[in-house]
């Protein structure tokens, strides 16, 4: 009874703003990820085997990067229940929900700049990646330069990660899932779209295949919408397909095709 009361009080306390203070914090469905064969102190910034990547399916829906703000709703046994405001989701109007290890969070800093270089190094030696955030003046200007908001530049940003291993829930230069790749590419250009493929499909403006332009997103269903790719022109698309594959460019597929959605110039 006492434990249940304590948990209820934690959940009832006002949400606090915190900032991720590790290169990548994995967001878990529940605070029981200790059984997975991963060392949170070094992963995912080290090599991950296929079996380890497969073990994430259904357990780790997303990630948050260094400097990204989260709202802490509760703390429980070394874990923090959070929502991520910059990752819109129908699961919670406040942002993508999940659990991270409490030690991966710290005090928020003001006026962060988004890292648009593939990798950058903080003064303390920590290596952070594309999409992370850091206070102004901490990194060289070239590492946080503002990217133009054009279709061609959006496609080039996605192409930076060709050959990168697919990672379920991945949202960093160490691995993307399908919607993580599209979310990260758009966000680098100042456009926030929902985190998951089905939510991206629901939020975008419908266009036809004949109207499709580079940067538009193509969606596929099996049987519900569960995969997204970005059109790059010339009848081709870039995608992060599955745990056995890497980010790749392939011809546009019509099998299981559900529709095209537009976020740029809607």
What are these regions (language model features)?
Residues 2-10:
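Bacterial N-terminal signal peptides
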Residues 12-39, 55, 66-68, 76, ...:
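Boundary regions of SH3-family modules and the immediately adjacent low-complexity/disordered segments
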Residues 31-52, 109-119, 185-199, 232-235:
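Short, basic/aromatic beta-hairpin or loop at an interaction surface
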Residues 43-44, 144, 205-206, 232-266:
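Aromatic- and glycine-rich peptidoglycan recognition patches
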Residues 53-59, 119-126, 201-208:
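Short alpha-helix capping/helix-loop boundary micro-motifs
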Residues 165-213:
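Catalytic cysteine-centered active-site loop
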Residues 217, 226-235:
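Catalytic nucleophile-His microenvironment captured as a short glycine-rich beta-strand/loop
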């Amino acid at each position: 009874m006492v434990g249940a009361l304590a948990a209820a009080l934690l959940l009832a306390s006002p949400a606090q703003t915190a900032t991720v203070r590790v290169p990548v914090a994995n967001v878990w469905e529940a605070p029981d990820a200790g059984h997975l064969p991963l060392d949170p102190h070094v992963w995912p910034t080290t090599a991950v085997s296929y079996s380890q990547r497969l073990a994430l399916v259904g357990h780790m829906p997303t990630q948050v990067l260094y400097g990204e703000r989260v709202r802490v709703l509760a703390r429980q046994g070394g874990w923090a229940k959070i929502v991520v405001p910059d990752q819109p989701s129908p699961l919670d109007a406040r942002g993508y929900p999940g659990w991270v290890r409490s030690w991966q969070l710290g005090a928020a800093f003001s006026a962060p700049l988004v890292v648009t270089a593939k990798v950058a190094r903080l003064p303390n030696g920590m290596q952070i990646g594309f999409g992370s955030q850091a206070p102004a003046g901490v990194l060289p200007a070239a590492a946080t330069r503002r990217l133009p908001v054009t279709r061609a530049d959006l496609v080039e940003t996605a192409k930076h990660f060709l050959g990168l291993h697919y990672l379920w829930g991945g949202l960093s230069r160490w691995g993307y899932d399908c919607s993580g790749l599209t979310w990260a590419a758009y966000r680098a250009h100042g456009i926030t779209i929902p985190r998951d493929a089905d939510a991206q499909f629901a939020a975008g403006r419908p266009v036809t295949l004949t109207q499709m332009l580079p940067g538009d997103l193509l969606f596929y269903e099996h049987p519900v919408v569960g995969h997204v790719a970005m059109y790059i022109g010339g009848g081709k698309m870039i995608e992060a397909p599955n745990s056995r594959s890497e980010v790749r460019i392939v011809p546009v597929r019509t099998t299981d095709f559900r529709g095209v959605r537009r976020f740029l110039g809607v």
